[in-house]
Design a protein with these regions (language model features):
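Beta-strand-loop-alpha-helix segment that lines the small-molecule cofactor/substrate pocket
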Residues: 17
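Structured mid-to-C-terminal alpha-helical surface segments
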Residues: 3-9, 20-271
Length: 271
């Protein structure tokens, strides 16, 4: 959202890839994910201290460290000198569109009229297939619903606190705000929930969710958000390079999404 669409003004330490596996066998997918992880992390050293590692047959998540030339302590630079790479064959990466990606360093060099330096270090803009904004909105919404079904919704939602900020940014686009209020959004969320219920076993109550109003996020959002607000303000302020949206503004945006979510009945839609 920051690099392809310039919608959010914050740094990120993770890179997410979705693999379109088609008719590939399970073993072929596993080998492809392993090969991709090696190719996109050439020159980096794996961070063995990273605990949330996964090397499954359809999902890989690893952290890689790099040399930080600017020696800032954690109080000044809270973003660790590492990149978290996630490659998934679980995802449903449709629809997508081709977007031009320009590194932050390249943007700076252009402003300084140093395009030759960008070329020297192979920092020219490049194209990538990027998930559409509608699908991004649905995926972040469903992710929050799924994580809210854990035994400790507050802790789980805290780990996904940036999704709330991202959803607020998406809701500033008039077409997306209108999309959320329509039947297309309801249908797309229903489809994605069913897809993710088939793909993910955790948390415990996720697969048995039949009505989104059973989700603590939908059922008790205002109280949850009040408890999450300090985490939102602390976490986002640390990685943003412009002022972050107020917690009240983020709350109002998500309430609009909730209005549509409350109309979804998974049992009815599957019958």
């Amino acid at each position: 959202m920051s690099k392809a669409f310039q919608l959010i003004d914050r740094f990120s330490e993770d890179v997410d890839f979705a693999v379109i596996s088609g008719d590939m066998s399970g073993n072929q997918v596993k080998m492809l994910l392993s090969k991709l992880m090696k190719e996109v992390t050439v020159g980096f050293a794996e961070d063995k201290s990273f605990a949330d590692i996964s090397k499954g047959s359809k999902y890989r998540k690893q952290a890689f460290s790099y040399d930080a030339l600017v020696g800032l302590d954690v109080s000044v630079n809270p973003i660790p000198s590492r990149i978290i790479v996630e490659i998934s064959a679980f995802a449903n990466p449709f629809p997508y569109e081709k977007r031009t990606i320009e590194p932050f360093v390249t943007t700076y060099l252009k402003k300084q009229h140093l395009e030759d330096v960008a070329s020297q270090y192979h920092l020219e803009p490049f194209e990538l297939n990027v998930l559409s904004l509608k699908q991004t909105l649905c995926e972040k919404t469903v992710s929050l619903i799924r994580f809210s079904m854990s035994q400790d919704p507050l802790a789980s939602l805290s780990s996904k606190i940036r999704h709330f900020c991202d959803l607020n940014a998406l809701m500033t686009i008039k077409d997306l705000e209108e999309y959320v209020c329509g039947v297309e959004f309801v249908r797309d969320v229903e489809t994605l929930v069913k897809h993710d219920q088939a793909a993910f076993d955790d948390p415990f109550g996720w697969k048995g969710l039949k009505d989104l109003t059973q989700s603590p996020l939908v059922l008790d959002f205002e109280n949850l958000w009040e408890a999450l607000t300090p985490r939102y303000e602390e976490n986002l302020s640390a990685i943003a390079y412009r002022e972050i949206p107020s917690s009240e503004r983020v709350k109002v945006s998500f309430l609009k999404i909730l209005d549509s979510l409350r109309t979804i009945n998974l049992t009815k839609s599957s019958g």
